[in-house]
Amino acid sequence: MLTLSDFDFDLPPELIAQTALPDRTASRLLAARHDAQGTHFDDRQFADLVDYLRPGDLLVFNDTRVIKARFFGHKASGGKIEVLVERLLDEHTVLAQIRSSKSPVAGSTLRLADAFDVTVGPRHEPFFTLRFPQPALELIEQYGRLPLPPYIEHTPDSFDETRYQTVYARTPGAVAAPTAGLHFDDALFARLDAMGVRRGFLTLHVGAGTFSPVRVENIAEHRMHSEWYAISPDLAEAIRATRAVGGRIVAVGTTSMRALESAAQPDGTLAAGSGETDIFITPGYRFRLVDALVTNFHLPKSTLLMLVSAFAGLETIRAAYRHAIAQRYRFFSYGDAMFLTRAEPDTQSASPDPSC
């Protein structure tokens, strides 16, 4: 039985990328390549992703847009608070985390950004409901701050407001970026279009739970956070058409992967619709839909590291991360990327070529 410690590794802190590169496709790409001799790792630039794709493949992107979900403010008593909006419930109401010396009570008001008051509603552990006096999204975008991940240590600036969004972000609602998509730009899309690689889009609003640590050693006891996703009939048809011509389904990011596998049917088709997913993918999971994955490097002991280990094989991921650390790749949200293909169930524990 795998435990939390099986997904731990030592990462030099200087390898945690603190800012994005000026050129999106200038990040590095670690591609895992398999042949009869084992697994090998290619050190490339992200623009070289085209060398690992084929005409007829379908790239599936998450088009969620990060909202300015963080606020600082105070209670009527003067006590300081920090608010992180987790989810938009309706035009005027949100779910939010509140950091305060004492939890606010229902019916009280909070002053946010020294600009407007919100009313505290019923609590839904671990969140509070907050009622905004005007359309919440408008006030969030006007007065909020971009919610950079906790391991990025600078105050967000105008550069972050551009680079912590994908170029195709269009559906507001996330509090963390689908970071594998940060590496794509219009020039790369033009090259992919020219070679016959297709694009599809879904929406999964990434919640702050993506950064929540796993607190139990027995990972089977972990309970995943829930996130909202939507899959269009157009994407479901694109999946069907791709399969019909022998193309591969390539998930861009773990959020796309989670949405696709949540909506995948036993026959390999995709069900259109929307809903909540708390899917927890760990080694032993049998993937129904996704053939390849573009992803960043993930935190030790994280559910996302478990997901990529389930997909590519635990030993492959361990070897890939050792290689990446030795080669000084940049890690986490603003870091470099990997290209992985799905391991067959009977090869997920196979050892990669030790010479890599």
Curated annotation (Swiss-Prot):
Involved pathway(s): tRNA modification; tRNA-queuosine biosynthesis
Catalytic activity of the protein: 7-aminomethyl-7-carbaguanosine(34) in tRNA + S-adenosyl-L-methionine = epoxyqueuosine(34) in tRNA + adenine + L-methionine + 2 H(+)
Compartment(s) of residence: Cytoplasm
Enzyme Commission number, as recorded: 2.4.99.17
Top-level taxonomic group: Bacteria
Coarse class of the protein's main subcellular location: cytoplasm
Biological process (GO), any one: queuosine biosynthetic process
Entries under InterPro entries matching the protein: QueA, QueA_dom1, QueA_dom2, QueA_sf
GO molecular function, one term: S-adenosylmethionine:tRNA ribosyltransferase-isomerase activity
Pfam families to which the protein is assigned, alphabetical: Queuosine_synth
Keywords assigned: Cytoplasm, Queuosine biosynthesis, S-adenosyl-L-methionine, Transferase
GO cellular component: cytoplasm
Family membership noted in the UniProt record: Belongs to the QueA family.
Subunit: Monomer.
Biological function: Transfers and isomerizes the ribose moiety from AdoMet to the 7-aminomethyl group of 7-deazaguanine (preQ1-tRNA) to give epoxyqueuosine (oQ-tRNA).
Protein's UniProt name: S-adenosylmethionine:tRNA ribosyltransferase-isomerase
